[in-house]
Amino acid sequence: MIKKRKKNPYEASASGFYISMSAHKARRIIDQIRGRSYEETLMILELMPYRACYPIFKLVYSAAANASHNMGLNEASLVISKAEVNEGATMKKFKPRARGRSYLIKRQTCHISIVLEDISYEEYEEDFLRRI
């Protein structure tokens, strides 16, 4: 039996599927931003010179937009609580070569999911539990 995970009301997420880049290259960026604040993450992603930064930047921005629009959370108090990269399907193409031959070209894809959490809620909850 598969148990459903309870959704935290102070978490917002965004996922990107079949992004055409290697999962290894995307993980290199995700490891740098995991656990950081939303504003710090945007600055890091804008300044890093890798091609993988742009789709990750769009996902972080989208998750923050989901948090502010759908849940009414403040963007200044958001932290990346969970960020993961999984391998997607591999697209296979044939490149024509000399004498009627062909070489196989594999195009890697990956799935990226980012979860932002409101840290002001955690501070409020800790204070509440101390009072009890």
Curated annotation (Swiss-Prot):
InterPro entries membership: Ribosomal_uL22, Ribosomal_uL22_bac/chlpt-type, Ribosomal_uL22_bac/org-type, Ribosomal_uL22_CS, Ribosomal_uL22_sf
Coiled coil ranges: none
One Pfam short name: Ribosomal_L22
Gene Ontology CC terms: chloroplast; large ribosomal subunit
UniProt GO MF annotations: rRNA binding; structural constituent of ribosome
GO annotation, biological process: translation
Keyword vocabulary terms for this entry: Chloroplast, Plastid, Ribonucleoprotein, Ribosomal protein, RNA-binding, rRNA-binding
Domain of life, per lineage: Eukaryota
The UniProt record lists the keyword Transmembrane helix: no
Subcellular location: Plastid, Chloroplast
Subunit: Part of the 50S ribosomal subunit.
Family of this protein: Belongs to the universal ribosomal protein uL22 family.
Function: This protein binds specifically to 23S rRNA.
Protein name per Swiss-Prot or TrEMBL: Large ribosomal subunit protein uL22c
Gene name tied to this protein: rpl22
